[in-house]
Amino acid sequence: MQLEELINQHYSKLNDNDFHILKYILNHKHTCYHLGIDALAKACSVSRSSILRLAQKLGFSGYSEFRVFLKWEDQPEEGESMSFEKLLDDIEANLKFLRTKDMTDMCQLIDAADRIFVYGSGNAQKICARDLQRMFIPRHRYLILIEDTNEFNLMRDDFKVNDLFIIISLSGETPELIPQARMLSAKGIPFISITNLKNNVLAQLTPHNLYATSKPVTLSDRTEIVAFAPFFLVGEALFRAYVDYKEAEKNDNE
Protein backbone atom coordinates (compact mmCIF):
# COMPACT_ATOMS: atom_id res chain seq x y z
CA MET A 1 0.00 0.00 0.00
CA GLN A 2 1.32 3.45 -0.92
CA LEU A 3 1.01 6.69 1.05
CA GLU A 4 -1.64 8.12 -1.30
CA GLU A 5 -3.84 5.07 -0.71
CA LEU A 6 -3.42 5.41 3.07
CA ILE A 7 -4.48 9.06 2.85
CA ASN A 8 -7.63 8.10 0.95
CA GLN A 9 -8.39 5.27 3.37
CA HIS A 10 -8.08 7.43 6.50
CA TYR A 11 -9.18 10.74 4.95
CA SER A 12 -12.09 11.32 7.35
CA LYS A 13 -9.75 11.20 10.36
CA LEU A 14 -7.35 13.85 9.05
CA ASN A 15 -7.45 17.55 9.88
CA ASP A 16 -5.84 20.65 8.34
CA ASN A 17 -2.69 20.20 10.41
CA ASP A 18 -2.34 16.61 9.18
CA PHE A 19 -2.70 17.74 5.56
CA HIS A 20 -0.06 20.41 6.14
CA ILE A 21 2.38 17.72 7.32
CA LEU A 22 1.42 15.35 4.50
CA LYS A 23 1.97 18.10 1.93
CA TYR A 24 5.56 18.42 3.13
CA ILE A 25 6.08 14.64 3.12
CA LEU A 26 4.61 14.21 -0.38
CA ASN A 27 6.80 17.03 -1.71
CA HIS A 28 9.94 15.57 -0.07
CA LYS A 29 9.32 11.84 -0.50
CA HIS A 30 12.94 11.05 -1.34
CA THR A 31 14.42 12.76 1.72
CA CYS A 32 11.89 13.07 4.56
CA TYR A 33 12.43 9.54 5.87
CA HIS A 34 15.99 10.55 6.73
CA LEU A 35 14.55 12.95 9.33
CA GLY A 36 13.87 11.99 12.91
CA ILE A 37 10.55 13.00 14.45
CA ASP A 38 11.93 16.23 15.92
CA ALA A 39 13.57 17.26 12.64
CA LEU A 40 10.39 16.55 10.67
CA ALA A 41 8.31 18.49 13.20
CA LYS A 42 10.68 21.45 12.85
CA ALA A 43 10.57 21.27 9.04
CA CYS A 44 6.76 21.34 9.16
CA SER A 45 6.61 23.94 11.95
CA VAL A 46 4.45 21.67 14.09
CA SER A 47 4.84 19.89 17.40
CA ARG A 48 6.39 16.47 17.87
CA SER A 49 3.04 15.12 19.06
CA SER A 50 1.37 16.27 15.82
CA ILE A 51 3.70 14.02 13.82
CA LEU A 52 3.03 11.11 16.16
CA ARG A 53 -0.75 11.57 15.98
CA LEU A 54 -0.64 11.67 12.18
CA ALA A 55 1.35 8.42 12.05
CA GLN A 56 -1.18 6.75 14.34
CA LYS A 57 -4.15 8.04 12.30
CA LEU A 58 -2.59 6.39 9.24
CA GLY A 59 -2.47 3.06 11.07
CA PHE A 60 1.12 3.00 12.33
CA SER A 61 2.15 2.28 15.92
CA GLY A 62 4.37 5.35 15.94
CA TYR A 63 6.69 7.54 13.90
CA SER A 64 9.43 4.91 13.68
CA GLU A 65 7.13 2.49 11.86
CA PHE A 66 5.85 5.31 9.61
CA ARG A 67 9.44 6.29 8.80
CA VAL A 68 10.30 2.71 7.78
CA PHE A 69 7.22 2.70 5.54
CA LEU A 70 8.34 5.93 3.83
CA LYS A 71 11.83 4.52 3.32
CA TRP A 72 10.41 1.29 1.87
CA GLU A 73 8.14 3.25 -0.46
CA ASP A 74 11.04 5.25 -1.87
CA GLN A 75 12.68 2.73 -4.15
CA PRO A 76 14.34 4.62 -6.99
CA GLU A 77 15.04 2.74 -10.17
CA GLU A 78 18.59 2.34 -11.42
CA GLY A 79 19.06 4.63 -14.37
CA GLU A 80 16.36 6.26 -16.48
CA SER A 81 13.65 3.86 -17.61
CA MET A 82 12.38 3.99 -21.18
CA SER A 83 8.69 4.12 -22.04
CA PHE A 84 8.31 0.35 -22.55
CA GLU A 85 10.10 -0.42 -19.28
CA LYS A 86 7.87 2.03 -17.42
CA LEU A 87 4.81 0.29 -18.84
CA LEU A 88 6.13 -3.00 -17.46
CA ASP A 89 6.79 -1.30 -14.12
CA ASP A 90 3.18 -0.08 -14.05
CA ILE A 91 1.84 -3.55 -14.82
CA GLU A 92 4.05 -5.14 -12.14
CA ALA A 93 2.87 -2.56 -9.59
CA ASN A 94 -0.75 -3.32 -10.48
CA LEU A 95 -0.21 -7.05 -10.15
CA LYS A 96 1.34 -6.51 -6.71
CA PHE A 97 -1.70 -4.45 -5.66
CA LEU A 98 -4.23 -6.93 -7.05
CA ARG A 99 -2.60 -9.94 -5.36
CA THR A 100 -3.25 -8.40 -1.96
CA LYS A 101 -6.57 -6.63 -2.62
CA ASP A 102 -9.66 -8.23 -1.09
CA MET A 103 -12.60 -7.51 -3.42
CA THR A 104 -15.21 -9.50 -1.49
CA ASP A 105 -17.18 -6.38 -0.54
CA MET A 106 -17.30 -5.26 -4.17
CA CYS A 107 -18.39 -8.71 -5.35
CA GLN A 108 -21.20 -8.64 -2.79
CA LEU A 109 -22.31 -5.24 -4.08
CA ILE A 110 -22.30 -6.48 -7.69
CA ASP A 111 -24.26 -9.58 -6.74
CA ALA A 112 -26.87 -7.73 -4.69
CA ALA A 113 -27.44 -4.75 -7.00
CA ASP A 114 -30.72 -4.48 -8.89
CA ARG A 115 -28.96 -2.46 -11.58
CA ILE A 116 -25.30 -1.75 -12.27
CA PHE A 117 -24.26 1.46 -14.01
CA VAL A 118 -20.74 1.95 -15.35
CA TYR A 119 -19.45 5.42 -16.07
CA GLY A 120 -16.14 6.50 -17.64
CA SER A 121 -15.10 10.15 -17.37
CA GLY A 122 -13.15 10.34 -20.66
CA ASN A 123 -12.83 8.63 -24.03
CA ALA A 124 -10.27 6.04 -22.93
CA GLN A 125 -12.20 5.46 -19.70
CA LYS A 126 -15.39 4.87 -21.71
CA ILE A 127 -13.58 2.16 -23.68
CA CYS A 128 -12.62 0.54 -20.36
CA ALA A 129 -16.27 0.83 -19.26
CA ARG A 130 -17.50 -0.88 -22.43
CA ASP A 131 -14.98 -3.66 -21.95
CA LEU A 132 -16.23 -4.17 -18.39
CA GLN A 133 -19.79 -4.24 -19.71
CA ARG A 134 -18.81 -6.92 -22.25
CA MET A 135 -17.05 -9.10 -19.66
CA PHE A 136 -20.03 -9.38 -17.32
CA ILE A 137 -22.52 -10.51 -19.99
CA PRO A 138 -21.68 -14.27 -19.70
CA ARG A 139 -22.38 -14.00 -15.95
CA HIS A 140 -25.83 -12.49 -16.65
CA ARG A 141 -24.95 -9.16 -15.07
CA TYR A 142 -25.88 -6.51 -17.61
CA LEU A 143 -24.08 -3.26 -16.95
CA ILE A 144 -25.75 -0.05 -18.12
CA LEU A 145 -23.24 2.31 -19.72
CA ILE A 146 -23.71 6.03 -19.03
CA GLU A 147 -22.18 7.92 -21.95
CA ASP A 148 -21.82 11.43 -20.56
CA THR A 149 -22.85 14.02 -17.98
CA ASN A 150 -26.10 14.83 -19.78
CA GLU A 151 -27.20 11.19 -19.67
CA PHE A 152 -26.34 11.00 -15.98
CA ASN A 153 -28.36 14.12 -15.19
CA LEU A 154 -31.38 12.88 -17.17
CA MET A 155 -31.33 9.60 -15.23
CA ARG A 156 -30.42 10.87 -11.77
CA ASP A 157 -33.96 11.00 -10.35
CA ASP A 158 -34.38 7.30 -11.16
CA PHE A 159 -31.27 6.12 -9.31
CA LYS A 160 -32.09 3.95 -6.27
CA VAL A 161 -30.20 2.77 -3.19
CA ASN A 162 -30.25 -0.78 -4.59
CA ASP A 163 -28.30 0.35 -7.65
CA LEU A 164 -24.51 0.18 -7.95
CA PHE A 165 -22.15 2.44 -9.88
CA ILE A 166 -18.68 1.64 -11.16
CA ILE A 167 -16.91 4.92 -11.94
CA ILE A 168 -13.67 4.93 -13.93
CA SER A 169 -11.54 8.09 -13.81
CA LEU A 170 -7.85 8.61 -14.49
CA SER A 171 -7.39 11.49 -12.06
CA GLY A 172 -10.38 11.04 -9.76
CA GLU A 173 -10.64 14.84 -9.90
CA THR A 174 -12.74 15.46 -13.05
CA PRO A 175 -14.73 18.64 -12.21
CA GLU A 176 -18.07 17.49 -13.65
CA LEU A 177 -17.73 14.05 -12.06
CA ILE A 178 -17.25 15.06 -8.42
CA PRO A 179 -20.72 16.64 -7.87
CA GLN A 180 -22.29 13.51 -9.36
CA ALA A 181 -20.28 11.24 -7.06
CA ARG A 182 -21.23 13.42 -4.08
CA MET A 183 -24.89 13.15 -5.07
CA LEU A 184 -24.63 9.34 -5.16
CA SER A 185 -22.96 9.34 -1.76
CA ALA A 186 -25.63 11.65 -0.30
CA LYS A 187 -28.42 9.39 -1.61
CA GLY A 188 -26.73 6.30 -0.12
CA ILE A 189 -26.09 4.76 -3.55
CA PRO A 190 -22.86 2.72 -3.42
CA PHE A 191 -20.16 3.08 -6.03
CA ILE A 192 -16.82 1.49 -6.82
CA SER A 193 -14.10 3.92 -7.91
CA ILE A 194 -11.33 2.91 -10.31
CA THR A 195 -8.69 5.65 -10.38
CA ASN A 196 -4.97 6.20 -10.67
CA LEU A 197 -3.08 5.59 -7.44
CA LYS A 198 -2.94 9.02 -5.87
CA ASN A 199 -4.81 11.08 -3.32
CA ASN A 200 -8.05 12.01 -5.11
CA VAL A 201 -11.56 13.23 -4.27
CA LEU A 202 -13.44 10.41 -5.97
CA ALA A 203 -11.69 7.72 -3.93
CA GLN A 204 -12.40 9.68 -0.74
CA LEU A 205 -16.15 9.55 -1.39
CA THR A 206 -16.43 5.76 -1.27
CA PRO A 207 -14.85 2.93 0.77
CA HIS A 208 -14.85 0.73 -2.35
CA ASN A 209 -11.66 1.68 -4.19
CA LEU A 210 -9.58 0.04 -6.88
CA TYR A 211 -6.35 1.64 -8.06
CA ALA A 212 -4.64 1.41 -11.44
CA THR A 213 -1.02 2.53 -11.25
CA SER A 214 -0.25 4.44 -14.43
CA LYS A 215 2.62 6.91 -14.25
CA PRO A 216 2.92 9.45 -17.09
CA VAL A 217 5.98 9.26 -19.33
CA THR A 218 7.39 12.47 -20.85
CA LEU A 219 9.10 11.98 -24.20
CA SER A 220 11.99 14.00 -25.61
CA ASP A 221 9.57 16.34 -27.43
CA ARG A 222 7.75 16.91 -24.11
CA THR A 223 4.77 14.83 -25.20
CA GLU A 224 3.24 13.05 -22.20
CA ILE A 225 1.77 9.58 -22.59
CA VAL A 226 -0.27 7.64 -20.04
CA ALA A 227 -0.90 3.89 -20.21
CA PHE A 228 -4.49 2.67 -19.90
CA ALA A 229 -3.55 -1.01 -19.91
CA PRO A 230 -3.55 -0.97 -16.06
CA PHE A 231 -7.20 0.15 -16.06
CA PHE A 232 -8.19 -2.75 -18.32
CA LEU A 233 -6.21 -5.08 -16.05
CA VAL A 234 -8.00 -3.83 -12.92
CA GLY A 235 -11.38 -4.17 -14.64
CA GLU A 236 -10.59 -7.73 -15.66
CA ALA A 237 -9.44 -8.49 -12.11
CA LEU A 238 -12.74 -7.22 -10.70
CA PHE A 239 -14.65 -9.45 -13.11
CA ARG A 240 -12.50 -12.51 -12.28
CA ALA A 241 -12.92 -11.85 -8.56
CA TYR A 242 -16.69 -11.84 -9.08
CA VAL A 243 -16.51 -15.12 -11.04
CA ASP A 244 -14.56 -16.73 -8.19
CA TYR A 245 -17.01 -15.29 -5.65
CA LYS A 246 -20.00 -16.85 -7.43
CA GLU A 247 -18.21 -20.19 -7.89
CA ALA A 248 -17.36 -20.32 -4.18
CA GLU A 249 -20.98 -19.48 -3.32
CA LYS A 250 -22.19 -22.27 -5.60
CA ASN A 251 -19.82 -24.79 -4.01
CA ASP A 252 -20.94 -23.77 -0.52
CA ASN A 253 -24.57 -24.41 -1.44
CA GLU A 254 -23.95 -27.89 -2.85
Swiss-Prot record:
Pfam families, A to Z: HTH_6 (PF01418), SIS (PF01380)
Domain (HTH rpiR-type) ranges: 1-77
Alphabetically ordered keywords of this record: Activator, DNA-binding, Transcription, Transcription regulation
UniProt KW DNA-binding keyword: yes
Gene Ontology biological process: carbohydrate derivative metabolic process; regulation of DNA-templated transcription
DNA-binding stretch(es), residue numbering of this chain: 37-56
Boundaries of every SIS domain copy: 106-248
Induction summary: By maltose; repressed by glucose.
Record-level Gene Ontology MF annotations: carbohydrate derivative binding; DNA binding; DNA-binding transcription factor activity
Functional note: Positive regulator of the glv operon expression, which consists of GlvA, GlvR and GlvC.
Name this protein carries in UniProt: HTH-type transcriptional regulator GlvR
Native species: Bacillus subtilis (strain 168)
